[in-house]
Structures are given as structure tokens and as C-alpha cells.
């Protein structure tokens, strides 16, 4: 086994958010966000799929987009990947039936940390005396969601300013703002608390989760004196994998981590902007022991993360 070191720039969430907010205020996303159209890359497993590098400029530093996030709450459940687990879960809770997962698992984050006040239907946001919908204040907005919302705008802006052949393609949204039109109930109705998703990729060649998930409840001290955490495992001591991840990542668990957003994807379905968990992601349960992602990668230089990538 050969270990290869790669140095990657990781942008701080606060800095990225501020840069994107300023770019929006100035109506100039291209000052921060750009797509490298001159260097189309072809996918190894499907030659009809192309990738374009996403670059951002924050505090004078230009690099492919990767950024950290901290203390964000995952909502909802991850569907199981096996028929046996579907049967077990539906037997345990027949009121909330689940279906077998047919794609990579995802973390889900709401726009607001707390739900807006809702009417009895559970979907309609209550209104004040002036007839305005009542939403939580800015202090209750998820920082990660705000970043993704602005990245969505910057992404669409860059596509429209790109090659003519790209402008006619369907641009896939980063945020779900409506209930799916295939839903049995309330299809296509607005969500009172929109959802952003971060993909947890599964390596198709090995069927192993791409990111390393760590358990923040179990800190350890490395030989160099830095703090890290044990890898996330189930009750039998099995590391997080595609078949047990739905048990390990529970609704309302808290997460720190790093997002890989270095490329957009062009396919027959349109143009998408995948946001994926990167190696070194920290899994945080509700218990908060005061250790954050900065303490793992260095408080002063999180922008320089050295990944140990194993090549069989």
C-alpha cells in the first residue's frame, strides 16, 4: 500500500460566506466564483459525463472550492440499503414506513435551526397581524445553508455567463424548496423549512464510504499531541459503511466537517453542482464536548489539510 500526500486549500465557512454575501450585494458573483470551462474533464466510467473545476477567490486566495462547516444539525433519516433493514425498520415503526435506498446517502440541513410556526396542516407557515409569514430571525439561520444558497446563485450565474452550449441545459438546484411532485400527499407544495443535502459518496469500485466519519464523543490524542477522534462504529464495533450508516447518523445529530465542491457535473440530466463530504469529516452527536474541527487540523492553518490517501 502506497501513501500519497495531497495538500488542499480548505476555506473557512465564515470567510466564504462573507465573500459570497459581498459579491451578491455588488451583483458580481464572478469576482468570487468561476468555472474553468477551458479544461473539461471526462468521467472515467462514463464518457458522456464531463466535469468542470469550480474556483473561488477568498481573501486573495484562489483555489478549487473546499470549505469547512461546524455545529450543523442533520435532519431526517437516511434510508437503509438492504431489504432486511427495510423489513426490520418498518416492523418497528409502521407509522413511518421507509423504502430501500437507491442512491448514495446524504446529510440533510434545514434553512432554519428551528421550525417556523406552522398551521395545523404542518406545512403552512403562520402569519402575523400584518398578513406576513412568520419566520425565525437571521440568528436562527444555518450558516451552512446560507453558503449553499449563495453558491446556488453563483453557480447559476456562472453557467449563464459560460459557453452558449451550456446556457440551454437544465441547471439542477442545490436546494429543495418544494415537496416532490411524486409525493402521495402535498406534492409540489412549498417546504416551510427548505433542505440542502450533502452527499456521502460510496466508492463504486470498493463499496466503501469515501469520507472517513469520526465520532466526536470519543476523542483521542495522537502521537503528535493533536486531538482527533475514533472512527465512527456501530454497537458491534463495525466501522461506518453503506449498510450501517443509516443507524449511525441519526436525525438531529450535530456535524462538523469539510465539503468538497471542486467540480460541476455535465450530463444528459443537465448541469449539477455536487456537494460531497471529504475525507477527514467529523461526525458529531448531540453531545458537545467543546472540541471543534479546528483543533484537529490546526487552529491557524485549517486551510492546509494534508490527506493521507491510500492507493491499493
Curated annotation (Swiss-Prot):
It is found in: Virion. Keywords: Early protein, Virion. GO terms for cellular component: virion component. Induction: Expressed in the early phase of the viral replicative cycle. Belongs to the asfivirus CP312R family. This is Uncharacterized protein CP312R. It comes from African swine fever virus (strain Badajoz 1971 Vero-adapted) (Ba71V).
